[in-house]
Amino acid sequence: MHRPEWAMLLDLPTITPILTAIFGSSDYIARGGGGDFCLPGATEYQPLHSDSGDRREFNGVTFGSFRDDRNKLTLRDLPCPYVCCNFLMVDFTAINGPTRQIPATQNSPRELPRRSQEPEWMKLSTVCPAPAGSVLIRDVRAWHGGTPNLSQEVRAIPNAEFLAPWYR
């Protein structure tokens, strides 16, 4: 976020009031930025996933961001701790690899379905149509994934990420 074109995404008059409402305070933290893209000819669905989870160790490597030493809470029990703002650079259409977002899964304790077990409605739960210039504001705990890009254009989505004031 050290470049001016990225830094300007951190305090937009259209986004700041929404983030303040989500976090209940204007003291939220800009975590960073990034994004993703989907190339033309991508024919597979990206597996559903969540961008944040409980802290776990696997083969000596720590993954995840939340840990309750009492083992009473999980990340999904908390209010929204972390938001990603995806900035749509092109129109999202049914054929250019729009993001699919599965409603009401940010607090779900269920395991993510494998691609082969995914119900059809989840594959069709896409954020489209949505015009270029729109912002997809999402709780990173919610299940989401990419879809095939059957168009001839690259679909890029830069993002800015924000943490609740209480979440470190």
What are these regions (language model features)?
Residues M1-A132, G145-E153, F162-R168:
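Non-heme Fe(II) oxygenase catalytic core, chiefly the N-lobe of the double-stranded beta-helix
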Residues V140-R141:
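Short, surface-exposed secondary-structure boundary micro-motifs
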